[in-house]
Amino acid sequence: MKTQVAKKEEVTRDWYLVDVDNKVLGRVATEIANVLRGKNKPTFTPSVDTGDFVIVVNAEKIALTGRKLADKTYYSHSSYPGGLKEITAGKLLDKKPEELLKKAVKGMLPKNKLARHMLKKLKIYSGGAHPHAAQNPKNLNI
């Protein structure tokens, strides 16, 4: 029996809808990262983007366990002297809830060029509505 290797032209992509209302951030992010990579498919190939599209709604209602809202800190730098900026998870959830989930999923994807293509298939929305109804997304139970 020969090993099946997926080809870029033969990949079929589905759309999945995830409602993260009162779901724990890390547990949701791992499931989303696996679907974006295509690890849920029998044709998974590490060097080919075989993943599906994921639509996330209610990002502002995601839950963090413990004291992470106050203690977990995200850093960024402007490349200028003294340009280190830091923001806690609680403030980031208030200002940009989509960014909090995007950072968690990005950290769980491989660190290569393929990850940028995978991350483009992630669509995150704060409210319960999304503009992708025409794609007929399937519900992904997490």
Swiss-Prot record:
GO terms for cellular component: cytosolic large ribosomal subunit. One of its GO terms (biological process) is translation. SUPFAM superfamilies: Ribosomal protein L13. The keyword Ribonucleoprotein applies. One of its GO terms (molecular function) is structural constituent of ribosome. Pfam families: Ribosomal_L13. Keywords: Ribonucleoprotein, Ribosomal protein. It comes from the Bacteria. InterPro entries: Ribosomal_uL13, Ribosomal_uL13_bac-type, Ribosomal_uL13_sf. HAMAP family: Ribosomal_uL13. PANTHER family: LARGE RIBOSOMAL SUBUNIT PROTEIN UL13M, RIBOSOMAL PROTEIN L13. This protein is one of the early assembly proteins of the 50S ribosomal subunit, although it is not seen to bind rRNA by itself. It is important during the early stages of 50S assembly. Part of the 50S ribosomal subunit. Belongs to the universal ribosomal protein uL13 family. This is Large ribosomal subunit protein uL13. The lineage of its organism: Bacteria, Pseudomonadati, Thermodesulfobacteriota, Desulfuromonadia, Geobacterales. The gene is rplM.
